[in-house]
């Protein structure tokens, strides 16, 4: 295994030594196995290629302050992948198989778990693909489950900072009752045109609901969080603060967002999931995107070019989002007690 400079490791793919694979044929899953071969022998008419029959996940393992490794909420990822599989008429990966594959990937790549204090983590990309050859439209009956581990650098190489977002009304990431609630590649591919256009402007992209283009759906590939206060924007007590996040059948239920909502309630905040009109940003003191990659990505402003409107939230991350960010990171790195049972500790 090549030497890795953890201090300069970026947020990108790094080749692991082993990946884990399992196959589904004749109605049953094989045993998972480790392999150094990173290439698939795949028929050109496989349903994953012809019709996009695939789903994936993303989760992390952290080297804690005590030197132990913690895997964060992998069971929730297993359950979400099962829902995605059912949504695309694929054989769900049993939770037990999912967990075994994650642990095998970790055991076979222990030297890829970054040291504590680097901000880097070991990322796992579980992937489920349809492999049955088909030309006629229809689902496959054979599937491959793969876990790809890769060490990744911190989302914020320096200081926890803000990002600017721009509103997009011309591209719909997912339909209200389509695949938006599942973690499938087509949702992300559908957003590339809009997100790349935003990146060329130095921004990221907010998607609105596909039906009316009125309500906030997602921030690029992440859930949206808004913080509302009943009086002065940044000076108030917690019982006067509301944590807002969209409720929609077109967005992916974020495990990070679910964790943050739990922590927000413990802080005494009111937590609300509902449809959020874009104009309600005017009433928010803080806003952010949230997900596995970044945990929380604070927003300094949202630009609505069509309405010639800019919503400002401050050039620095707000106090509520900052507290939530550090509280969750402290749990993941073992700096505070995990009272929720979110992490599974491995003494390595």
List the predicted regions and their residue ranges.
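Extended, Lys/Arg-enriched charged tracts that mediate electrostatic binding to polyanionic substrates
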Residues: 115-129
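Helix-start/capping segments and mature chain N-termini
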Residues: 1-101, 105, 127, 134-234, ...
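Charged, gly/pro-rich active-site loop segments
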Residues: 95-97, 105-119
């Amino acid at each position: 295994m090549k030497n890795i400079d953890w201090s300069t490791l970026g947020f990108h793919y790094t080749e692991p030594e082993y990946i884990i694979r399992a196959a589904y044929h004749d109605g049953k899953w094989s045993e998972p196995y480790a392999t150094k071969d990173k290439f698939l022998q795949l028929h050109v008419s496989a349903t994953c290629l012809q019709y996009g029959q695939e789903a994936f996940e993303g989760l992390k393992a952290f080297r804690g302050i005590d030197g132990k490794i913690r895997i964060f909420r992998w069971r929730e990822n297993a359950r979400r992948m099962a829902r995605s599989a059912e949504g695309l008429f694929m054989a769900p990966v049993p939770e037990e198989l999912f967990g075994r594959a994650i642990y095998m990937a970790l055991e076979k790549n222990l030297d890829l778990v970054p040291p504590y204090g680097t901000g880097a983590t070991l990322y796992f990309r579980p992937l489920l693909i349809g492999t049955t050859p088909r030309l006629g439209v229809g689902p496959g009956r054979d599937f491959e489950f793969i876990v790809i581990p890769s060490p990744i650098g911190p989302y914020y190489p320096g200081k926890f900072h803000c990002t600017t977002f721009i509103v997009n009304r011309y591209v719909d990431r997912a339909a209200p009752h389509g695949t938006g609630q599942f973690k499938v590649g087509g949702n992300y591919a559908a957003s590339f045109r809009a997100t790349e256009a935003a990146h060329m402007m130095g921004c990221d992209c907010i998607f609105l609901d596909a039906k009316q283009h009125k309500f906030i759906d997602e921030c690029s590939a992440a859930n949206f969080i808004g913080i509302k206060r009943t009086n002065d924007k940044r000076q108030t007590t917690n019982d006067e603060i509301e944590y807002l996040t969209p409720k929609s059948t077109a967005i992916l239920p974020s495990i990070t967002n679910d964790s943050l909502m739990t922590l927000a309630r413990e802080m005494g905040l009111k937590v609300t999931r509902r449809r959020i009109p874009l104009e309600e940003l005017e009433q928010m003191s803080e806003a952010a995107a949230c997900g596995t990659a970044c945990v929380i990505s604070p927003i300094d402003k949202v630009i609505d070019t069509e309405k010639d409107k800019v919503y400002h939230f401050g050039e620095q991350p707000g106090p509520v989002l900052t507290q939530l960010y550090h509280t969750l990171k402290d749990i993941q790195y073992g700096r505070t007690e995990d009272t929720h049972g979110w992490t599974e500790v491995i003494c390595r």
